[in-house]
Amino acid sequence: MQHRLTHPRIHALEAALASRPPLRAPAVAGQAQAAVALLLRVHQGRVELMLIRRAEREGDPWSGHMALPGGRAQADDAGMAATAARETREEVGVDVATGRLLGALDDLAPRSAAIPSIVVSPFVFHVPENVEVRLNHEVQLALWIAVDELLQGDAVTEYLHDLADGNTLRFPAFDARGYVVWGMTHRILTGFLELYAQTGAPEASE
């Protein structure tokens, strides 16, 4: 089922995504592939984005991080968009088939050598406002936040990572209602927000 587009920002975002084909990373032997979903809904006249907090899991480099629904590709996935759809259904119970695929963002890879070699493909979906969310064991919480909140100056912050040698690394981050979004998710959101900001003026809450 294709969910009807009812918000001008959604229309404009779909057009903006269509106007700029995403940059795809060349295939590298042995490199893992993954996909994430930027789930958008319209609530009280504002476009909102779903963020999740991953459960604490030993051995998971993204344990406890704020993130987007998604995960690694499987051999039977019919492309990376299908990977994003399957992982979203498994992690948060949302079937993106009830909505619409708006487009894709550029592929990204981790910048840290401590993270496994992987390429992540982000996809943007519009889903119904009343979509049901059911978290599995991999996800601690799901949060809907107005996209325009992330565009405000006070959402810009830093994540401080303390090293064993006593030094501290600083990473650019977003403050999403008290939850710090950094790393690859911050990079994905930065690219998305740059595009979204071009689609219209900020929305007033109702």
Q: Which residues fall in each region the model found?
A:
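N-terminal leader/linker segments that precede catalytic domains of diphosphate-processing enzymes
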Residues: 1-67, 72-131, 148, 163, ...
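Short, charged, solvent-exposed linker or helix-capping segments at domain edges/interfaces
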Residues: 133-137, 154-155
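Acidic, glycine-rich loop-and-strand cores that form catalytic or ligand-binding grooves
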Residues: 135-149
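A mid-sequence, solvent-exposed acidic-amphipathic segment
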Residues: 150-158
